[in-house]
C-alpha cells in the first residue's frame, strides 16, 4: 500500500491559499465525478460531491454540491471540518487547524483530522459505473464517542450551468424509512441519500439557504456568486474504529 500512497502533511502553521489551490478528483467510469479542494471550499463551479453522468439530453449534471461537516467533541468544542467561502474574501477555514494529513490511497482521497486527542479520517469513494458517492468517516482514536453533523447543500444544474440561476421550482424532500430523496422538478432524477451509523438521523430545519462564492470563476470573469439549498442535517455518533 505504501507504494500506492501519496501524502501531504501539514505540520505547524498552514498557508490558507495552499488549501484552496490543491485539488482532488475521483471518477466513476461513466463520465461522472467528485472533486474539490483540500479545504472543502468549492472554488470552481465544477466542484461537487456528485456530478452525475446522466443520459442525453442531460449529460453531466451537478446533483450534490457540498457537505458541511461539524464534529462535536464530548465536553469540548464543535469543529467545522470543511471550509466555506460565502462572499469574496470571507473564507471560514477552521479546518486548517485540525487537518493533519491529506493523502491519496490507490488514487482515492483521505483526510486525517486531529483535535483534542481525537483522530478522524474521511474518505470519498465512487463505485465503478454508478452515479453514486460514498463519504466515509472513521474514528481512529479517542476515548469517548464523538458526534458528527453532516449538512448536504445542493443546487441541481447542468454541468456548465450558471451558479446564480435558481431552480425553477422548490425542492421536495421525500422520506421513506431511513432513505431520503430530494426532488428538483421533472428535468432531474431524484438525489437519494442515506446515513449509516450509530443513532443516525436527519433533523429538518425548513430549508436553509447558503451563499457560496466561486473564486476561480470570478478570476476568469464568469458567473461566481450563487446559493445552495439544504433540507437539514444528518447526525450520528462515532466510536473508536467505527464508521458513519
Which residue stretches match the model-derived regions?
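Terminal accessory carbohydrate-recognition/targeting modules of carbohydrate-active enzymes
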Residues: 1-244
